[in-house]
Amino acid sequence: ADQLAHSAIAPTGPAWQQIRERFGTEVFDEHGMVDRPKLGTLVFASYEARAALNKIVHPHVRVAISEWFTDLERLPSHCFGIVAIPLYFESSNAAPFDKIIVTACRSDTQLARVRMRGLSLHEARQRIDAQLPTDQKVRHADYAIWTDGRRADTDRRVQAISRELSAFSTT
């Protein structure tokens, strides 16, 4: 979904003009590209700005996901499709899926990972606070993949879920 959102806000994307009209030229660079760090600072500091951006971008992402699944269904050998949607539960109009998988980690790990993107402690906390708490996401999901441990443990969990989903998709 992140790639679809990036495409939607590109200069040739369907959301570009709406972002320009709503947020102004200050969130664009000299080449006409959305300056994602500037826009991120703005939308994670204001619920209203974040809601406005989501209202602009999410419909385009939902259409693209729907088209992708339609194309997938036409393939003779498809088992299941996976869509990575970072803010699935935070989206007011979350699309229905047969199964939901959440990747999760401890809060200290989450904070460290967000900080690795070059954000200040304050900015990182703003972004985390804008999300549904991990324990709530895990409760709403069909599967949870905890990513704090060893890579091999995560890989085993992914394989187990994949086997279960393969069985589910053939029923």
Task: Please annotate each region the language model reported.
Residues 1, 100-104, 121-122:
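Short hydrophobic/aromatic-enriched beta-strand-loop microsegments
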Residues 3, 41, 99, 142-143:
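Well-ordered beta-strand positions
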Residues 34, 56-57, 105, 129-132, ...:
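Short beta->alpha linker loops
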